């Protein structure tokens, strides 16, 4: 669920960067994705896309799955749930922590995908 993913991102980065900055970044952060990731942050998004692909192969619906998590001072943790809920939550938490530790390059926000993502 994108709302929960947004909350996880804010928990992991302690509110340092608004979630919308990640929605149109590089070749993979946002809808779809193709080509070679432009940097570490974009690689986080590709890994997240791949994780959602694995969730779908397991019969889960990652964009619709609601899950439980707790935001601790050290970052988010998945709480109880079904196999699909735990899998999708783990995908989102891994991405949120990856975003938090990866540098953000303003030059890779809202790039020309047709030119840079081949």
UniProtKB/Swiss-Prot annotation:
Its EC number is 3.1.1.4. It comes from the Eukaryota. Snake venom phospholipase A2 (PLA2) that inhibits neuromuscular transmission by blocking acetylcholine release from the nerve termini. PLA2 catalyzes the calcium-dependent hydrolysis of the 2-acyl groups in 3-sn-phosphoglycerides. Expressed by the venom gland. It comes from Laticauda colubrina. The active site is at residues 48, 92. Keywords: Calcium, Disulfide bond, Hydrolase, Lipid degradation, Lipid metabolism, Metal-binding, Neurotoxin, Presynaptic neurotoxin, Secreted, Toxin. Its main location: secreted. This is Basic phospholipase A2 2. It is an enzyme of class 3 (hydrolase). PANTHER family: PHOSPHOLIPASE A2, PHOSPHOLIPASE A2 FAMILY MEMBER. It is found in: Secreted. InterPro entries: PLipase_A2, PLipase_A2_Asp_AS, PLipase_A2_dom, PLipase_A2_dom_sf, PLipase_A2_His_AS. It catalyses: a 1,2-diacyl-sn-glycero-3-phosphocholine + H2O = a 1-acyl-sn-glycero-3-phosphocholine + a fatty acid + H(+). Belongs to the phospholipase A2 family. Group I subfamily. D49 sub-subfamily. Disulfide bonds join 11-71, 27-117, 29-45, 44-98, 51-91, 60-84, 78-89. GO terms for molecular function: calcium ion binding; calcium-dependent phospholipase A2 activity; phospholipid binding; toxin activity. Its cofactor is Ca(2+). Binds 1 Ca(2+) ion. GO terms for cellular component: extracellular region. One of its GO terms (biological process) is arachidonate secretion. The lineage of its organism: Eukaryota, Metazoa, Chordata, Craniata, Vertebrata. SMART domains: PA2c.
């Amino acid at each position: 669920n994108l709302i929960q993913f947004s909350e996880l991102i804010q928990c992991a980065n302690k509110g340092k960067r608004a979630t919308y900055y990640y929605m149109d970044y590089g070749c993979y952060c946002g809808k779809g994705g193709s080509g070679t990731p432009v940097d570490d942050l974009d690689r986080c998004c590709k890994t997240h896309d791949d994780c959602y692909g694995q969730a779908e192969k397991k019969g889960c619906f990652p964009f619709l799955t609601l899950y439980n998590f707790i935001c601790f001072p050290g970052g988010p943790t998945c709480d109880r749930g079904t196999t699909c809920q735990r899998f999708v939550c783990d995908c989102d938490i891994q991405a949120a922590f990856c975003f938090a530790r990866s540098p953000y390059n303003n030059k890779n926000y809202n790039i020309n995908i047709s030119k840079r993502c081949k």
